[in-house]
Amino acid sequence: MYANVKPEDLITVTIKSRKETLFEGRAFSVTSQNEGGFFDILPFHTNYVTLVKDFVVLDKGLATEKNIQLDKGIVTVTSNIVRVYVGI
């Protein structure tokens, strides 16, 4: 799936709306946009909380890329776990 990447080096990602889980799994990167512009979350990212808008892309530029459209949401990063709450 990811060449030369150990499973423990991937980010655990959960993306949820009020009604359903949109994604639950592992990814190498998470890309989105906030008021300051575009940003990436990579493995072992520092703890982080931000509001996001428009989209979340998992594994941007890789064969496993997944794009999730949203109006707005919140992203939290803690201990290599990314949680995205859509529609907040």
Describe every region a protein language model picked out.
Residues 4-7:
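Structural preference for solvent-exposed beta-strand-turn elements
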Residues 12-88:
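Compact, glycine-rich, soluble single-domain proteins
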